[in-house]
Amino acid sequence: MSYRENNHKFESKQNTIEVDIIDGCNAKCLCCPRGLRIFPNTMKVMDLELYKKIVDKAYDYGKRVIALFSWGEPFLVQNLSEYCKYAHDKGMYVCLSSNFSMKIKDLEGILKYANHLYVSVSGFTQEVYQITHRGCKIDLVKENIDKINQLLNDGKIDVDTELRYFGYDYNEFEFHLWEEYLKDSKIKVVLQPGNSNPRINLYLLSKGQKPTQWFGKVCWYGDPYYDEVQNVYCSMVRKFTINANGDMVLCCEKAFDDNLVIGNFLEDDIYEMQEKKLKSKQCDYCFMKREFINILKKSEKDLIKQHKFI
């Protein structure tokens, strides 16, 4: 089953808020701007009380799905279960994502408050895995995957778990090893086309150049970009993306760019920030926004004109 054929719950939802509860990641992946350290890796953790206020405001505005990640690794937050529990207890659909290359103390305590979990890998053996996932250990990933399997089998957690295998020209031959490894598991194994090419990025870095191809035809520093990687409708216009400082950013795809902050989520008006998003010249170059506007019902278009679209 391909990534795009796997129409899971998270992608079918439109009322999503994405919150980076930590501004950092332990991995140095060659196809990720965070991993490449194109932007700072501060490891700043969002204060729990700030997070609760953000969740409350988002809930009041109708958001019922929350992803505790954008460009950060949520499992590095020591009290992650408290963040999950707060949103879960409000009745929100809680999503997590991780490289899983770490020791996790209370996996059950975290995942009992989660509804969906992504685990991202790029190999089955350490030799292949470490090409893209620099600084990560595949044995730790498998250890955590085995724990989840046991918890699922014992009925101690009920979380839709998806292992996403980022496929490149050098590693697709190991995808079937994960399929075999999890053939009797409740965990879904999905092949997802990888962004860019880690070997090209490594070459560019060696030449002192910035590898930008990982993101389709992105032009950095506020220039227009064309997303040719994803070819399906994505509700980025409706999605709220919040960084670890509590600021709302234009788009989750470039949430790391401070120049694209459109307001403070708690202090500023939601409708005014959404208006900025809809009027953004940057977004005019993104086909996902155009497709989104094209499929809106007339009533929703009227709401946009009234600045009441969230």
Functional labels for PLM-detected ranges:
Residues 20, 61-69, 88-95, 112-123, ...:
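Conserved C-terminal portion of the radical SAM core fold
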Residues 1-116, 127, 131-135, 139, ...:
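Conserved alpha-helical substructure of the radical SAM core
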Residues 76, 103, 170-171, 258, ...:
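Alpha-helix N-cap/loop-to-helix initiation residues
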Residues 133, 147, 158, 229, ...:
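Intrinsically disordered, low-complexity Ser/Thr/Pro-rich tracts
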Residues 2-20, 187-310:
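Accessory C-terminal segments flanking Radical SAM cores
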Residues 40-46, 117-123, 259-268:
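Short, exposed beta-strand "edge-strand" segments with a Pro/Gly-rich flavor and a Y/T-containing core
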